[in-house]
Amino acid sequence: MSVDELPSSLRPASLSDWDAGRSMGRLIVAWQHPTLRLISPVGVLEHGPTGYRFRYLRRARELAGFQPFLDFPAWHGDYRDERLFPLFAQRIMSPRRPDFRHFLDQLDLSPDASPWEQLARSGGRSEGDTLQVFPAPVVEADGSTACMFLVSGIRYCNGGVLPHLAVGDRLELRDEPGNSANPEALHVCVAGQPIGWIPDLMIDYVRTSRRSGPVLLTVVHVNGSDAPAHLRVLVRLEGTVPPGYQPMAGPGWETFVID
C-alpha cells in the first residue's frame, strides 16, 4: 500500500481544520544519519478513530546504517495501539512540567493542544536524537495546497542570528545549487538574506508547488534566541500543485504492509 491510498478516516479533513496536525492523519517518520546528517523517510505513523498505526516504508530497508527501531523490530510489522506508541509519546512534553505552557507558546499551540498536535508541530525532535516526524501537506481537489513547517538549519545561517521578523512577513525562496549535501536545497530568505532552509523532506513538494504557480511563504510565529534553533521560525506555505500530485506519496513511498 502506498501512503497516498489511506482510508478517508485517516485523511486530514481540509486545509481549514488541518493546521499542521490538528486533525487525524499521518506523519512521515524520518531518520537522520548520525555522521552524514542526511535525513531520510523510514516509516508512516497514522492516527485514526481507533488509535495509532506504524508501518515501515520499503525504502527503509535499503538505507545504509538504518536498523529497525527497538519498539518496531520487524520490517513487515503492522503495529497498532489505542495509545500513542512510547517511541513517539516520550517526545511529547508532560503537562505536569512547569514549562509546559511556555513550550506550547513556542509551538504556537493552544493550551488544550493534543499530544498528536504537539508531535506534528514540534517534529518530535530531542537533543542528540536521530528521529523526527513531518506532517504530510494537504492537497485539495482543486490543487490548492498549504502546510506549516519549522525553518531548518537556522543555527548554520549568520551564526543563528535572525533579522527582525514579524507575523505575516513575506519570505522568499532561493535555489542553492552549490549545496554539496543537496543541490536541490532551497534557502528561506528575508529581503535576500538567508535565514535557513526548507526541510529536506519538503523540497520535492515545495519545488512542485513553485513549478505550478506562485507560492506564498509567510511567517506564522517567531521565538526568541532562548528557544531551540529548530523552533525559532514557524512558516506557512500556500500554493498549487498539478492534478493528481500527492506529497510524500506514490513511487518510493510504499509500505511493507498493505491493507
Please provide the spans of the model-predicted regions.
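Conserved active-site motif detector
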Residues: 2-259
